[in-house]
Amino acid sequence: MGFFDRFQRKKPLTEAQKRWNKLWFLWFKGGIESPYEELMTYQSEVTNGGHGQYFINTLLWKTHMQTLHTILPDILWENLQAACDAFEAEDDETLAECDTMFDRNQHLVAEILQAHADTLAL
């Protein structure tokens, strides 16, 4: 073992981290059930480029709205509705405010997803 090898050692993943990784792997492969698939798509798109990116990249976003309503906490559901209205009205300022509101509350989505990940078998 060389000198620098000791800096490359990684701690083994915890069971929770393994389940989290499995959740995202299943989503990537299209093997995650509704409503988690829609929630993960929403979170991924909004986190990477805002609500505008979500609406542009997700062709079925209008269909996903009903599903997201069943799983999103009220504060995020109301924010998504406001973002939808802003997107359709081409109101970039309000859309940016909705992105900020999502950023402040995305821990709520992470908690929902982690709770689901915790149910996955390894």
Can you annotate each of these PLM segments?
Residues 3-122:
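Extended, alpha-helix-rich binding/interface surfaces that flank or overlap catalytic cores
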